[in-house]
């Protein structure tokens, strides 16, 4: 019975520490996403390494969401399967990059 109580307490403490990490927001260049589900501060998004689309629990880094993008046509493919006119437009949509060039 004592072992069960200790195990229950340890599990509860582990879940509490995980929950507090999951709601924590972080700034530019800081680690985000991943197993802990760390969120970025407002005005930022969690950008994953290019080509790392649809990988469960992968971490990224917080990047600024651009407010203005120049109209330069250099298409990139987002992890959402959409082709963006340039990398700035992709970042403004808060989408990680799959690859340079149009989506297939």
Q: For each predicted feature, which ranges?
A:
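Bacterial N-terminal signal peptides that target proteins for export
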Residues: 1-9
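Bacterial N-terminal signal peptides
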Residues: 10-17
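Signal peptide cleavage region of secreted peptide precursors
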Residues: 20-23
């Amino acid at each position: 019975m004592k072992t069960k109580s200790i195990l229950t307490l340890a599990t509860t403490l582990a879940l509490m520490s995980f929950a507090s990490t999951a709601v924590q927001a972080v700034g530019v260049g800081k680690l985000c996403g991943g197993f802990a589900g760390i969120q970025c501060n407002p005005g930022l998004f969690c950008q994953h390494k290019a080509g790392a689309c649809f990988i469960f629990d992968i971490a990224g880094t917080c990047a600024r969401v651009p407010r203005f993008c120049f109209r330069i046509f250099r298409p990139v493919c987002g992890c959402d399967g959409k082709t963006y006119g340039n990398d700035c437009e992709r970042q403004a949509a808060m989408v990680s990059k799959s690859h340079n060039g149009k989506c297939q």
